[in-house]
């Protein structure tokens, strides 16, 4: 059976793993998922991730979750643009999460990036998810 929202599935695995205090979670690999994880890592929401290759054309991303004083660094993580309803924004209307304490991750013509990077580069795009 095919998955209709692979990115949403990855975000749900991260959310569930953090609520169960798992040290790491795994998800099937894709370029988009890896780019989103790059942003989460650079912004300090995860420790890191690694690609596990099974050799038959299948690979998996192992995501190391981050905790501070026993609590997950990620309080909320959710999908904004969904397969049935895509959300596109211009640079002027990029949403702020928790008055700038969280981030919005966008897919832009210049790549996947956080909201503050998109504002600096003056590009809009599809709002993938928000993290706080």
From Swiss-Prot:
Signal sequence, renumbered to the chain: none
Keywords: Ribonucleoprotein, Ribosomal protein, RNA-binding, rRNA-binding
Gene Ontology MF annotations: rRNA binding; structural constituent of ribosome
Top-rank taxon: Bacteria
Keyword Ubl conjugation: no
Assigned GO CC terms: ribonucleoprotein complex; ribosome
Pfam family membership, one: Ribosomal_S8
GO biological process, one term: translation
Complex formation: Part of the 30S ribosomal subunit. Contacts proteins S5 and S12.
Family, as annotated: Belongs to the universal ribosomal protein uS8 family.
Task performed by this protein: One of the primary rRNA binding proteins, it binds directly to 16S rRNA central domain where it helps coordinate assembly of the platform of the 30S subunit.
Record protein name field: Small ribosomal subunit protein uS8
Gene expressing this chain: rpsH
């Amino acid at each position: 059976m095919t998955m209709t929202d692979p990115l949403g599935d990855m975000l749900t695995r991260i959310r569930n793993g953090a609520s169960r205090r798992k040290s790491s979670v795994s998800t099937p690999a894709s370029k988009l998922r890896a780019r989103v994880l790059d942003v989460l890592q650079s912004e300090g929401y995860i420790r890191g991730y690694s690609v596990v290759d099974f050799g038959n054309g299948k690979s998996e991303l192992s995501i190391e979750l981050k905790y501070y004083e026993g609590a997950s660094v990620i309080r909320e993580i959710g999908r904004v643009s969904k397969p049935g309803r895509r959300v596109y924004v211009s640079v002027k209307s990029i949403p702020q999460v928790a008055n700038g304490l969280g981030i919005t991750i966008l897919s832009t013509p210049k790549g996947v990036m956080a909201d503050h990077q998109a504002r600096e580069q003056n590009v809009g795009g599809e709002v993938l998810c928000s993290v706080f």
